[in-house]
Amino acid sequence: MLSASRLTIANLRIAQPRVAAIRTRKHCAALPGLSLSGRRWFSRKAHDSAKVAPPACPPPPPSEKSNTPYIIGAIALTAGGLGLAYKLGLFDSDPVLEQSSSLGIKASKKSKSPFPPSSKDLPKEVPYLLIGGGTASFAAFRAIKGHDAKAKVLVISNEPEMPYMRPPLSKELWFNPEEKAQLEPLKFRQWNGVERSIYYEPEDFYIDPRQLLDAPNGGVAIARGYEVQRIDVVNRKAILTDGTEISYGECLLATGARPKNLPAFEAASLAVKEYTTLFKSVNDFEELSEKLKAGSKVAIIGGGFLGSELACALSKFSEIREKNLEIYQLFHEEGNMGKVLPEYLSYWTTDRVREEGVKVWPKTQVKAAEVQDKKLRLTLTDDSSLVVDHAIIAVGSEPNTDLAKTSNLEVDPKLGGFVVDAELRARSHLYVAGDAACFYDPKLGRRRVEHHDHAVVSGRLAGENMAGKNKPYTHQSMFWSDLGPRIGYEAIGLVDSSLPTVAVFAKVDPPEVIPDTSEKLQAANATVIPASATAPSSAGAKASVLNHPGIVKAEEKLAAAAKKEEENDDFNKGVIFYLRDEKVVGVVLWNIFNRIGTARKIIAQHTHYDDLNEVAKLFNLHDRPEETEAE
């Protein structure tokens, strides 16, 4: 816990929400202990939520017999079995099954055909049906099997992939050297230095959908490349796009979210689409990796989590692979993570992203796109243009609720997502988890969350309830992000820059106190500094209390002066409290790790704190994390 003298060295900031309209033209995580180009990356820390451990290694194969007659007999039996399997068509499965072999060799092309090849091969009735093949579904079927060991679970996914984790797609996978990427393109190093695949389980964990109903011990089958068109809730049936009906006992909708597009690209020609990527899936990652040739110019459109993470990751990718890429990041906010972070911290973050080699263009929007001379020309709203080789659109996502209209399910008009009750039920025997669920939070009101931790926890709880547990969803989910070597943060609750914030940052060298007559301070809309804040501490340090420039000024000179003042600050480590009705509803832990449980308790108390400076002591701002060397 911080001593009183240490606390006065902290820099306290109070921010009010900005209210001005946005003007035109004016991103698992980094790898702790991994040295890249002489710099140590500290970031991905122990995840707060329960994690599913990777599967245990299979037992060693039995020793070979040296008896020649037995070997000859075995060869004959094997040949006969292979011949029978060929006649039965068991070798007609989708080639995607071989793409993540134990050797990690990348397949040249992935088949887009469904598996099994025909919907006639799918079970006509299953006890548990999960629609969607992402993290929420994975957590759900693990929970179901945990409570019903012989459960028979069918997962229907519209992707040609087994369930996999998405966070590494914008982070760790880009840090692999060329030779490793060629052999093991979908493996990454975790925060603890251990390497693993993005796939949650190896393929032999799953059972063939055609064998599911006959399996004496049950199992989980993944039907890939199929789409559910409608749910008959009354009769408990899922109807596929080709009319195939599958009856279920319990059903989960884990349809996730899909990436948003921009009008300029939606209205563009088909040729433009060849030069753009709506980044979301492993297929997007692989295609983008192939398109990033040496010397390419890449525009990333979007300043939120995905856009900022990709910008930093691609810059590091360029350095590791010696690609000499030019990375541009364009967004309409005034700084990176502008919808999440207080404005002063957003400005500071933008400067750190630029230090990573990214050319950041804030307050910029694209109004048109066209292909010229095999290049993509982006016309901006101020009529200037940017010519690049490829554009990545990362402007957020929207819940996939297509089933709502065809199945008469309720969607929240403001937040989107299927409306569910406390047990994550949308209707009887029909549950929703992950990005597509709009649930009620007793402390924060109705919410919809698009983060990995929420997908894991909501999927697990939905699976338990499908197995008969009837538990309410009370978890306050967290999320994390890493932007280069200097920024790694965890957050929980309502984290929105439109809310008032109070931040406490640790300062190694105490800043000079800015008197309340300072022109710069006035330009920043500073509050009067209380005497207690300017009085010397026992260590001779002082603290400054500022009100960040949340309201956009009418004149650019004032805004520039405020920004210049902010640039002199160093926000390396701190805690930001987000307030609503003077109660803490969200917390960002800025380069502070393994304290998310404390933040969760503060939000759960749902009370007014007279002195958030005292609350900040709970996070031990001056503790130093232990450094561990990479293997």
Task: Please give the residue ranges for each predicted region.
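N-terminal mitochondrial targeting presequence
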Residues: M1-N67
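FAD-binding core/adjacent interface of flavoenzyme oxidoreductases
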Residues: G73-G80, L84-L129, A143, P202-A299, ...
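Mid-to-C-terminal Rossmann-like scaffold of FAD/NAD(P)H-dependent oxidoreductases
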Residues: P114-S119, K124-P127, A436-F593
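Rossmann-like NAD(P)H-binding beta-loop-alpha module
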Residues: F141, N283, E287-L341
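N-terminal Rossmann-like dinucleotide/flavin-binding domain of flavoprotein oxidoreductases
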Residues: A143-E245, L341-K359
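A Rossmann-like FAD-binding core segment of flavoenzymes
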Residues: Y199, G219-R230, N235, I246, ...
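FAD-site-proximal beta/loop scaffold in flavoenzymes
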Residues: A271-A294, R377, D383-N465
